[in-house]
């Protein structure tokens, strides 16, 4: 066997350059880019390996470690998990900045490879710059924090350990059932240490994602339940998208008259105007899907984690409603006391469709149509919500939705906009709705937009977020300028955390700490004037084109101008506080105070206790 002498970092880059994923006979190169924020813990190791060349991986310069890792997460999500962008950081604070992004990727079942620098394996110069010492164990470093948010963690304390570590990292990253964040911590001395690696380690390696088929026993049990159902419903989760099973899902629902609701991750897989599409389901869902859910006697949940926002904290469905969960991940199949179908979504849906030949549900077709149309009428009311005081949030959203083309991508993650968008947004082509709502990570929108644009450079990308998110994290706006990427950043400025203020008020609390106001010297509280911020000026300082918008006319004019020039654009849209959509036929369990001197809080607690009497306990 022939060998080649390389540093560990050089070998890592060479290995990543030869990784491919195959799905349905089509190969996808798994790594074409790598993000990095260089520091002393990586610049002369991985940085040197990247600079030296001899590979086909492009370096992308992140501006903040968390934010570039969020961009990498969004990239992999938009690529249906068939390509990733690894992220390199220095040690200490640079490494720690990526922990949040790791949690985001793992919560959403998205592959993310993190390569943080670490302290010296030899320990000779300890304690080194940016090293935190732990008195209980010399072997512990801050990168151990990744263990709690990653599906695979390893620390490379010898250069030859790369071979087993890299293979196991790829095993997890390419496994649809077990994917999430992966961390390979790299002691900075080991990055530069050389080893005679076997050339076979660097051969082209194809990871095959063979579709897992449904077993005969599982299929028979599911068909027995479905055929006995009069009012079945389906839930379209993100797994349908990642399995590229939208056509099979639509065919099953249309053929057998099974209405369906969409999760945040599943929305946009199918057009909004399909007759069986009842829209968003759950806490941030709409009236149509939630009312159908309350009447359903069987629910077929496909590719969904069944989070509290989908099930309304397990309150939405009737006591006698049975669940069938079709999922590639065993962990998800037993939720809601379901009959499990452990298989690929496309393969499982096709088998169910064939097995249900001749079956059609007992739903009244006219009633379903009326329920759906009533909700569409409500959507139009929100989109046409004109107010003399200024722009409402839903009116601005509607203007942008109607302006965008079917191929344009809309994305978001946190605040009140995800609720508005799951309820109201009318998606175009498949894959044009990109919502991170597993972790609802503030900052994903502003930075993830970079990743989405890198994944789909031929499409226009519109990112939706509030002023709270922008203030928290927006460093990769500059990277969009650097990479000549036109991204449309739609900032809805309501002077605070409007979503949380709304929750606060709905649970009996007065507004407190959720609006951006000056400290009042007379009261000592944050109840002074609202803090005015010129976000457009801030964006211009980075090199973006930017508009300040207060009227419908200004918004339409800015949208037109934004599409006809090469720069990334920020639309600073001043919207009326509290002008988001309310909830519809749903409930969400939160930690309301059991004891309080505030009467409205006492009432909110009692209302919650009443709802708890109607929930499923598991």
Description of each model-found segment:
Residues 123-136, 333-334, 342, 349-350, ...:
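Thiamine diphosphate
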Residues 37-46, 372-453:
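Active-site diphosphate/adenylate-binding microenvironment
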Residues 2-362, 399, 403-406, 486-489, ...:
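N-terminal alpha/beta PP-like core and its mobile active-site loop of ThDP/TPP-dependent enzymes
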Residues 157-160, 183, 198, 224, ...:
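Phosphate/pyrophosphate-binding active-site segments
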Residues 150-153, 379, 383, 546:
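Short amphipathic alpha-helical interaction patches enriched in hydrophobic/aromatic residues
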Residues 61, 186, 262, 412-414, ...:
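Pocket-edge structural micro-motifs
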Residues 6, 10, 28, 243, ...:
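Conserved structured core elements
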Residues 31-32, 85-87, 128, 207-208, ...:
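A short, structure-level motif marking secondary-structure boundaries and short turns
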